[in-house]
Amino acid sequence: MASRMGMVAIMSLFVYAIVVPTSVNANAWQTDDKPGVNRNMEMQQQQGGFIGHRPRLASFNRASNQEGDRKRTVPSGPNHKHNNIPSHTPHHPPSYVQALYEDDRTITSPGPSKSIGPPPLPDRY
C-alpha cells in the first residue's frame, strides 16, 4: 500500500514537472496584443537595438572628394606584379594530361603473368 502511494506521488510530481514549465513557456511567447512575439525582442525593438548581422553601408564620399572630382585611372592589361602567366600563352591543361588521351593504345592491362600485390617478403629464417 505504501509503495502504491509512493508511486502515485512520484507520478504526480513527474506530470507536474512536465505540464507547468510547458504552460509557462507558452505564456512567455505571447504578449497582450501580439501573439507569437517574444517580450525580449519587443523590448529591443523599442529601445532601438538590432538582432543579427548588421550590414555595412557603402560610402561614396571619399572617391568624389579627390582632386577635381575626376575619375581614377585604372590600369589596363594583366597585372604582372601578381600574375606570373604571360598574357600571350593560352590557358589549357598541362601537357601530361593531353598525353594520356593521345597515347591510349600504349596503355595495356597487366596480364596473368604480372601479379599485382605486395612485394614478396625476404627470407628471414
From Swiss-Prot:
Region feature Disordered, mapped onto this chain: 45-125
Gene name for this UniProt entry: ESR3
Modified residues (Hydroxyproline): 75, 78
GO biological process, one term: cell-cell signaling involved in cell fate commitment
Signal peptide start-end: 1-26
GO terms assigned for molecular function: receptor serine/threonine kinase binding
Transmembrane regions: none
Record's keyword terms, sorted: Developmental protein, Differentiation, Glycoprotein, Hydroxylation, Secreted, Signal
Originating species: Zea mays
Bridged cysteine pairs (disulfide): none
Keyword Secreted tagged: yes
Glycosylated residues (UniProt): 78
Designated name of the protein: CLAVATA3/ESR (CLE)-related protein ESR3
Similarity annotation: Belongs to the CLV3/ESR signal peptide family.
A GO CC term attached to the entry: apoplast
